[in-house]
Amino acid sequence: MKSLSRAGLGLIVLACATRAVTAQEISGLVADREASAELAKIVATVRQNGLPLEPILAKVQYAVMVRSPAPRIVAAAHAVAARLEDARSALAPQPTATDIVAGENALWSGVSRKSLEEVRKVSPNKPVAVPLGVLAQLVVSSVPEKKATKYVTDLIKRGATSDQLVALGNDVNAEVRLGTRAMDALEVRMNRLNAVLGVPGANGDAASVPTSLQSGDGKKKP
């Protein structure tokens, strides 16, 4: 499983996303003059490109907190800026700032650009920050990315609410931390959702759901 510090930083990103960020606020966190000047350039470029600055602030704050050297802080800020651009492109045509932030965090968590595009494909006209956050959480919890993407996109198509998606991610994460295998925890939670949403029908969606979930009894067939 990936480190908890990664998941923790994701929470910092979402918390910072509720307010505006200034260039001075970011560059001023680093005492090294050269690094501070480089951070100011990164911030200016990100702002000029119309991308949210909050993830960069979160990254720099975290790096300073753990006493990372200045060059690593600058490199990390560059990487965040690149992921923000990649996330916006993958979530085109009109992602919200929150979508972009969630997309950047997902990419950092090990989710591929292709998976971001798959989520956008099944939800072309709605915000996707919550599904992307849950997808990232499942991947961090050691659910294979392709399977996690399949489950999340299937749930979107079947009308799962944001609360249901969030509960799924939180429950799986909690079970994994207690020692349960990620896929076992996911199947149990999916089975419960099937009871609410209905078992996938014969329209092709069922192919993405394990047989144990289609049976409705929560037990794997031999």
Explain the meaning of each model-derived region.
Residues 22-222:
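General marker for long, soluble alpha-helical cores
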Residues 17-20:
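N-terminal signal peptide c-region/cleavage motif recognized by signal peptidases
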Residues 1-9:
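Bacterial N-terminal signal peptides that target proteins for export
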